[in-house]
Design a protein with these regions (language model features):
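Alpha-helical elements of Rossmann-like donor-binding domains used by nucleotide-donor carbohydrate transfer enzymes
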Residues: 80, 208, 315-318
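Rossmann-like dinucleotide/flavin-binding elements
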Residues: 1-5, 9-35, 153-198, 283-331
Length: 344
C-alpha cells in the first residue's frame, strides 16, 4: 500500500508549525512543506527588528517564550521557533515550493519543486495552506519599479549612509524604515499617496516620525503619487497634478504585501472580487474545496492587518478538531512505514 499522509501543511511559519503540532498531538501523520527556511518571513525581516507584540502572544505548542525583552527581537523569535520545531520534531521539507494540488478530499496529490528543480510528490488526505503573505509585494505598476535600485523589502541602513533614499508608503514599515535611514545619515524622502500617515502606525512610532517630518529631518511628500522611477530620480505627481522630479539613489517601495491569490485560485479556492478574501468557513477554516483548509493571514485577503501570529496560531486547533470529527480521520498505513512518505 502506498503511504498516505493524514495532513500536509504548506508553510513552516508560526501558524504552519502550530497546525503541524496540533496534528501531531492528535496522532495524525503530518508533513510540512516549506519553500524557504524555517519561519522564512521572520528570517526576511530587518536584522534589528523588534516585534510590536509581547512574547506570550507569539507562543505556540504551549512552549514558553523566555526572553529578557518584553517585545522580542527578530533574533529571539528565530531562536524560539527553532527550539519549538526541535522539541516537537516537526517533520519539514525545506526549500520545496508547492506548485499544485490535484485530487479530492481524502486523496490529494501535492506536487512540489525543490530549489534544484527536482520534482516532488506527496499524497495526503487533507491539506492546510498556511503560506502567509510576505512573499508577494503590492506593486505600484509604474515604469522603473523593476530597476535594481528598487526593493520592496527593507534590511539594514548602513549601506545607505549619505545616499538619497526614497521610502514609498505610509504605514509602520515605511515609517520605521524612514526613521532608521535618517538615523544612519541617509537623506530620506517619504512619499505617500494619502494626505496623512496610516492610522495603523504604532503609538510609539507615530510621534517620532511626525516630529522628524515637522522639523524637516525627513522630507514628506503627502498626497503624492509615484509616476516613474529612473536611474537617478523618482518622478511624482502632487495632489495639484504637478509633476515633480526628486533626485534619488535608492528606493524602498514599502507598499504592503498580499497572499498568493493565484495559487489559491489554481487549487480551486474562490476569491471574493471585492475584498480578495478566500472562501473559508470561519468555524472550521475549511475552504470551498473540501479537505483544503486555510490558516493564518492567507484568510484575510488584502486586509492583512487583521490576522497576525497572535491570532493565526490558534487556527490549527479549529482545523484539526474538524478533521478529527470525520470518520476515519486517520489514514490507513502499513505498520512498516511509519512517518512521512519517502521523497520521490
Amino acid at each position: 500500500m502506498e503511504c498516505v499522509l493524514d495532513v500536509l501543511v504548506i508553510g513552516a511559519g508560526p501558524t504552519g508549525l502550530a497546525c503541524a503540532i496540533e496534528a501531531m498531538r492528535s496522532n495524525l501523520d503530518v508533513l510540512v512543506v516549506e519553500k524557504g527556511c524555517l519561519v522564512n518571513s521572520i528570517f526576511s525581516y530587518p536584522p534589528g527588528m523588534t516585534f510590536f507584540t509581547t512574547r506570550e502572544r507569539l507562543e505556540i505548542g504551549d512552549i514558553p517564550f523566555t526572553t529578557i525583552n518584553v517585545k522580542p527581537t527578530r533574533a529571539e523569535a528565530l531562536e524560539y521557533y527553532r527550539g519549538v520545531a526541535r522539541f516537537y520534531h516537526v517533520p519539514v521539507r525545506y526549500h520545496e515550493r508547492v506548485v499544485g494540488i490535484a485530487g479530492s478530499d481524502g486523496n490529494f496529490e501535492v506536487r512540489a519543486a525543490a530549489t534544484d528543480g527536482d520534482p516532488k510528490c506527496y499524497r495526503t488526505r487533507k491539506v492546510i495552506i498556511a503560506t502567509g503573505y510576505y512573499d508577494i509585494p503590492n506593486l505600484m505598476g509604474v515604469p522603473g519599479e523593476d530597476l535594481p535600485k528598487v526593493s520592496h523589502y527593507y534590511g539594514e541602513a548602513h549601506a545607505f549612509y549619505q545616499r538619497k533614499v526614497a521610502v514609498i508608503g505610509g504605514a509602520n514599515s515605511a515609517a520605521i524604515a524612514a526613521l532608521d535611514l535618517f538615523r544612519h545619515s541617509a537623506e530620506v524622502t517619504l512619499i505617500h499617496r494619502e494626505p496623512e500617515l496610516s492610522r495603523h502606525i504604532k503609538y510609539w512610532v507615530r510621534p517620532d516620525i511626525e516630529n522628524r517630518i515637522k522639523e524637516g529631518s525627513i522630507r514628506a511628500c503627502m498626497a503624492t503619487a509615484v509616476r516613474e522611477i529612473t536611474r537617478d530620480a523618482v518622478w511624482v505627481e502632487t495632489a495639484q497634478g504637478e509633476p515633480t522630479r526628486i533626485e534619488n539613489d535608492y528606493v524602498f517601495a514599502l507598499t504592503g504585501y498580499h497572499p498568493d491569490f493565484e495559487f489559491l485560485r489554481r487549487v480551486g479556492v474562490e476569491i471574493d472580487p471585492g475584498t480578495s478574501r478566500p472562501n473559508c468557513n470561519a468555524k472550521t477554516r475549511e475552504s470551498n474545496v473540501p479537505g483544503v483548509y486555510l490558516a493564518g493571514v492567507v484568510i484575510s485577503g488584502r486586509h492583512t492587518n487583521e490576522i497576525f501570529i497572535e491570532n493565526g496560531r490558534f487556527h490549527g486547533n479549529q482545523i484539526i478538531a474538524d478533521i478529527q470529527k470525520h470518520p476515519g480521520a486517520r489514514a490507513p498505513r502499513p505498520k512498516e512505514t511509519a512517518g512521512p512518505p519517502p521523497l520521490e
